[in-house]
């Protein structure tokens, strides 16, 4: 069953394929956003995890940055994970960069340690199935801005 939504998944770097696969399994039409022309008629946006500095540079280099920022500022629904949160934040406490700046929060990059400290673990919930969890360096929200 199709949802009728066309969701753009930023696909210039990072963990975009997992988001795309899950959304497609739910019946959503997904578009990998790789160039400015891909942005035109999306109904929602996913900004995946990855490296926010690289994503920001690629968005500018591919001339996608301003078009995405305008759509977000005009109310485009966004799901942002990890690097996506950093791209949206209005302030980054441990970085001089600000990207879209459309979400009024202050975030801290790599707040949970270094990449080398990332790991996977398995847990069992309600004695029903094993669930693999991935723990990574990630940002956290330090403050909600005015």
Where are these regions (language model features)?
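Structural signal for conserved beta-strand scaffold positions within catalytic alpha/beta enzyme cores
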Residues: 9, 32, 80, 101-104, ...
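Flexible, glycine-rich phosphate/dinucleotide-binding loops
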Residues: 16, 39, 87, 94, ...
């Amino acid at each position: 069953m199709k949802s009728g939504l066309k969701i753009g998944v930023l696909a210039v770097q990072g963990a975009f394929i997992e988001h795309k696969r899950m959304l497609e399994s739910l019946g959503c039409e997904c578009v990998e956003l790789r160039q400015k022309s891909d942005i035109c008629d999306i109904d929602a946006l996913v900004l995946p995890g990855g490296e926010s500095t690289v994503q920001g540079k690629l968005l500018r280099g591919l001339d996608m940055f301003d078009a995405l920022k305008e759509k977000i500022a005009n109310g485009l629904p966004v799901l942002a994970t990890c690097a996506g949160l950093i791209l949206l934040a209005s302030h980054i406490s441990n970085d001089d960069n600000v990207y879209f700046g459309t979400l009024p929060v202050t975030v801290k990059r790599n707040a949970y340690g270094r990449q080398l400290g990332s790991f996977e673990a398995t847990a069992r919930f309600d004695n029903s199935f094993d669930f693999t969890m991935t723990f990574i360096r990630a940002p956290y929200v330090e403050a909600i801005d005015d």
